A protein has these predicted regions:
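Flexible mid-to-C-terminal extensions adjoining Fe-S/redox cofactors in radical SAM and related proteins
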Residues: 1-9, 15-19, 23-25, 38, ...
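Hydrophobic alpha-helical segments, especially N-terminal targeting/anchoring helices
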Residues: 13-14, 270
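Canonical Radical SAM [4Fe-4S] cluster-binding loop centered on the CxxxCxxC motif
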Residues: 31-71, 83, 279-283
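Exposed loop/turn and edge beta-strand positions of beta-sandwich/beta-sheet ligand-binding modules
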Residues: 38, 85-87, 264, 273
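Short cysteine/histidine-rich metal-coordination sites, predominantly Zn2+-binding motifs
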Residues: 66-75, 331-339
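Radical SAM/AdoMet-radical enzyme domain recognition
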Residues: 68-92, 99-203
Length: 339
């Protein structure tokens, strides 16, 4: 069991089940932020050979890699002298598996008792690499924008190695109908053995086109109605934080089971150039370099104005307004209920 108790912030997690609990002064209170981030999202490169048209990082074949030495500096900078380090990291890119020192990065993470997770396009997955990662990884996410992108043999490599596997499905206005089929259970056989499918909100950043952002439509409402459906056999599913305002506004999911955006509140993003920001979509805004500032100077002080602004920025008449941070800080157009 993982635990952290600091003043009016309390957190426990079961690494086996993934169940977490967070509370404030009493069990009914929510803490505003964590004195030590629970998770760090780290881009270990901006190098990727796949060239997806919707890549929000605009990654390409550029050999921009975070060195192992700088990666270790990042991890050690987050190790609070009194309260310890982050519990886990989510490694991204670029494509993490194209980093020449990827396995060493995993080893350095584990050596510090931090759980590594990573997202991949799957191109570089082999039985050998999956065998090397077995027992060392919290979870792997395969990123797709269409079920046609999902190779069953790549899934099998991960599942056969005993690695918890999620699907990250990038949800745009172009694939809402296919997403509805997923929630109707039409792809159950293909998705057999996965842990969950996570729908990621399409962001108009990098190479992604603004015209493909989700809009209020018949397909969108049909998708939300299927979210509420409880009688269909289908894989477990979830959403990224950017979709949460729409869930709170339009669905009937119990809000107690929904976490709003945690960037700069409970999680942090660090890019391959060692810039620290609330999340990977900040595009250089609210960003501070670890080469210029100590991590806890950034976390405890530099992010304060961001937290004040976005703690409750919802301007919509909604019964769950008090639970919602409001629209996306960097791409308000992706929040359909934003006015």
């Amino acid at each position: 069991m993982l635990e952290r108790h600091i003043a009016d912030y309390h957190f426990i997690a079961d690494p086996t089940t993934g169940m977490t609990m967070r509370w404030g002064t009493t069990i009914k209170d929510n803490p505003t932020w964590a004195p030590v981030p629970e998770l760090a999202d780290i881009s270990i490169s901006n190098h990727c050979s796949k060239g997806c048209s919707f890549c929000y990082k605009d990654s390409c074949i550029n050999n921009e890699f975070l060195s192992v030495e700088d990666y270790c500096r990042i991890l050690d900078s987050m190790n609070h002298p009194q309260y310890g380090n982050v519990f886990q990291v989510a490694l991204g890119g670029g494509e993490p598996l194209e980093h020449p020192d990827f396995l060493e990065i995993i080893a350095e993470t584990c050596r510090r008792s931090i759980v590594p997770n990573f997202t991949t396009n799957g191109m570089q997955l082999t039985p050998k690499i999956c065998g090397s990662l077995s027992g060392k990884i919290g979870a792997v996410a395969l990123s797709v924008s269409s079920m046609a992108d999902l190779e069953k043999k790549k899934l099998a490599f991960l599942i056969d190695a005993g690695i918890k596997t999620n699907i990250h499905y990038v949800l745009s206005k172009n694939n809402l109908e296919e997403a509805c089929k997923i929630l109707r259970g039409c792809y159950n056989e293909m998705l057999n053995g996965i842990n969950a499918i996570i729908f990621l909100t399409y962001k108009p950043a990098g190479r992604a086109n603004a015209k493909d952002v989700i809009q209020d439509s018949k397909s969108f409402r049909a998708f939300l109605s299927l979210v509420d459906e409880t009688s269909i056999a289908r894989p477990r599913f979830g959403f990224d934080a950017c979709f949460v305002p729409m869930l709170l506004k339009f669905s009937h999911i119990n809000p107690l089971f929904i976490d709003t955006c945690e960037g700069a509140f409970f999680s942090v993003y660090i890019d391959h150039k060692m810039n620290v920001s609330p999340c990977s979509f900040s595009a250089g805004k609210d960003s501070y370099s670890l080469k210029d500032f100590a991590f806890y100077d950034i976390w405890n002080h530099k992010f304060n104005s961001y937290r004040i602004k976005w703690k409750s920025n919802c301007s919509v008449d909604c019964m769950h307004k008090s639970l919602c941070h409001g629209n996306s800080p960097y791409y308000p157009q992706i929040t359909i209920c934003h006015e």
